[in-house]
Amino acid sequence: MEIVYHICCGIDVHARFLVACLLGDGKQVTRRFSTMTCDLVKLREWLTDNGCEYVAIESTGVYWKPVFNILEGDLKVILVNPEHARALRGRKTDRLDSIRLAELLSVGLLEGSFIPPPHIRRLRELTRYRESLVRTHTAAVNRIQKVIESANIKLAQVASDVMGISGRRMLSALAAGVTDPASMAQLALGKLKHKQAELQQALDGALDTSHRFVLGELLRRVRELEAAQEKVNAQINRAISDPDHPQLLKAWELIQTIPGVGHIVAEVVIAEIGVNLRESFPTAGHLASWSGICPGNKRSGGKRFSGKTRRGNRYFRTILVQAAWAATHTKQTYLSAMYRRLVRRMGKKKALVAAAHTLAVMIYHIIDRSKPYLELGADYFDRTQPEKQLRYHVKRLQAMGFKVTLEKAIEMA
């Protein structure tokens, strides 16, 4: 095969060490380095001294990140999905893996993964940390529900939000050792304070010392997690408003012009795909494919097989589906009309994924063109496809047993 990169390097990365294979001028040199920063600097110097410009690294857990951070300023680093560079059956060693990566890179057979610039990666670190805090917070709240249910406290049957202000006051009293249901019911605020009888019955349980201890610890944990979320939100706001990168704030504002899309969705979108989209995604279709939100394309022998969506960026895919759910339940909008139109023939789940795909396309063009969302209206399909709507309604009437004859109304002068 034709050589594309005459001097290149393949690196097999592990937690404690890496093996680098340098190919060039008909020579093959393999060296081993530790993953300490001082050794990674030596690796960079070795590569640059030998005229290497292109490096391929397998995306192994988080171990590739320190190597990438050290090399990216001076070299063109290509992060490779291990599935795309898998060796044939046979011997497998770290040295052979690095040689295989270098050989595949030299002939241009490796496709690099999308790696955003450093300021986007810093924002991504914050949004993903927030997502982990939210998951942990949800788990703690669910655990609180289980603890009080196991003690026969039926607060959830009376209060719509157990973790609201009134609910927390009563839960704190339970954890503190209060046993009188009437006194705890007096802690209710708002509309809930008018349900004293129901609250007293719901709070009449059997908490033992273990229940109280666990409940108190969980309430403390929830408060800590909420405080941590406030801190990370402040950091995200500062990153979005960074004066050195004003395009972030502009994109953040433009994305929120889509109905049902809020500031959290906009923050995650920017953190996952950045704002210079055409550098990595030539078209909106490329972005949808990368996110795993479009149908698979499996054909063989003239037949099409499963159209199941492919694997993609789970953070971006998740936030797209969540945003699509909110957008499709807005009133008198294009997205809600599209969802209702699709759900009739493909069901709720597939229609939601289709709406998420449409949302990804919208986001791409909004960021790329730096223009706000243009609402097409809930009657868009009626206006643009009147014949199709006519055939649909005729077919429905015929299915109900009616004989349909269409006659155009006479227009009055």
What do these predicted ranges mean?
Residues 1-413:
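A detector of single, family-specific signature residues
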